[in-house]
Amino acid sequence: MPAMVGHIRIVNIGSSGIFHIGDVFAIRPISYSRAFAGAGSFNVGDNVSVYNYQSATTVNDSDVVDQAIIGST
């Protein structure tokens, strides 16, 4: 449906974000990433204590594509 839109101020849009005004048939944001992390990674919270004396992240990813995403460039 048509609408009158007033002033718009865009502060920030992330890399996989969508800004949309008006009618739309489909919105399909596409994003993919790969992360390798060892022990003690991705910890959140207050007063996190992690003791990892011997830790190694071994990465042997021999395939080229993990999962094909249709529509990606």
From Swiss-Prot:
Domain of life: Bacteria
Entries under InterPro entries matching the protein: Spore_germination_GerPA (IPR019618)
Keywords: Germination, Sporulation
One GO process term, biological-process aspect: sporulation resulting in formation of a cellular spore
Electron transport among keywords: no
Induction behaviour: Expression is sigma K-dependent and negatively regulated by GerE.
Similarity field: Belongs to the GerPA/GerPF family.
Function: Required for the formation of functionally normal spores. Could be involved in the establishment of normal spore coat structure and/or permeability, which allows the access of germinants to their receptor.
Protein name: Probable spore germination protein GerPA
Organism: Bacillus cereus
